Regions:
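Pepsin/retropepsin-fold aspartyl endopeptidases
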Residues: 17-303
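Bacterial Sec-dependent N-terminal signal peptides
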Residues: 1-22
Length: 303
């Protein structure tokens, strides 16, 4: 009987839509020296499992990393080995144990770090979602001195020293200020007519809203409502409501309908003081060029 129930559950999980959100919050750690060898770097990326995968090297070994603005810094895969939990971290589905590791040398394009602290997690479920080996995640502590351009039409990431003139790029369609909530860039917008604070998370394969907004957004502004599975870095699939929402508005710019999943973000608010209403993930980034300038604390969008 248990085998039958297990088979039914497995079949159900294959049929229902599944989403990965590689969001992680931990307390800030000490960082190493950063060397900027030039003013500009261009890095190709692959979209796998709804996430941005780039090539980087750690301690002389090159491999696949998820470029994740929802991650605090360098997060390395624990390779299924047990590790000593150094502290607690927060994800979209709850609290998880996080290990600590010394990264002797890290290289991503022009970005070079030495002797910096990284986080340690088992990311095997992300490997399954992406269909490839994943060495870890790259987040805020690596990116914070730069303007990072997500050029989806050309499948490339461009990294500039913050404040460098981008003379070859056209004037952006939209420029927005952002504030940092922990390590996450947060902008103000409206979703389904409701004013919300949205974190920009390039490690999320789907947009996320706190579940209270499912009822706050009028039914007329929601369509294709279904139950779907949402998995955070704690690797616990959570069944949530999902819907296409007619309008996401940033200032006077209205974006096309996008899909959102609705889940309880109370863990982030209550335990880590991350007061956000949701996350804009890959559905927001794709089909356009989006730049996050950490130095100027501005987001630029080209459509």
């Amino acid at each position: 009987m248990k085998k039958v129930l297990g088979l039914l559950l497995f079949t159900y999980q294959l049929l229902i839509a599944q989403h990965q959100v590689a969001f992680l919050h931990v307390e800030p750690q000490a960082t190493g020296m950063v060397a900027m060898s030039s003013a500009f770097s261009e890095i190709p990326f692959e979209l796998a499992g709804g996430m941005i995968v780039v090539q980087a090297s750690v301690n002389g070994e090159t491999g696949n990393f998820i470029l994740d603005t929802g991650a605090p810094g360098i997060v390395l895969d624990a390779k299924n080995d047990a590790f000593v939990a150094s502290y607690k971290g927060g994800s979209v589905n709850g609290i998880l144990n996080v290990g600590q590791v010394l990264v002797k040398d890290f290289q991503l394009g022009i970005i070079h770090e030495e002797k910096t602290q990284g986080n340690l997690l088992d990311v095997h479920h992300l490997e399954l979602a992406c269909g490839m080996d994943i060495m870890g995640l790259i987040g805020y502590e690596v990116l914070k001195g730069y303007e990072v351009v997500f050029d989806f039409p050309n499948h490339r990431i461009q990294a500039f020293k913050s404040g460098t003139t981008r003379s070859s790029m056209q004037k952006p369609t939209l420029a927005l200020p952002f504030m940092l909530c922990g390590h996450v860039p947060v902008i103000v917008g409206k979703v389904g007519g409701k004013r919300v604070f949205l974190g920009l998370d390039s490690g999320a394969s789907v947009n996320v809203l706190d579940r209270k907004y499912f009822k706050k957004i009028k039914a007329a502004n929601r369509s294709n409502v279904k139950q779907e599975l949402l998995t955070g870095l704690e690797n616990t699939p959570n069944q949530v409501m999902a819907a296409d929402v007619t309008e996401t508005r940033l200032r006077s710019t209205s974006l096309p309908p996008m899909r959102y999943v609705f889940t309880d973000l109370g863990c982030l608010r209550d335990n880590f003081d991350i007061a956000i209403d949701g996350l804009l993930g890959i559905p927001f980034f794709k089909d356009k060029v989006v730049s996050i300038d950490y130095g100027q604390k501005k987001v630029f969008i080209w459509e």
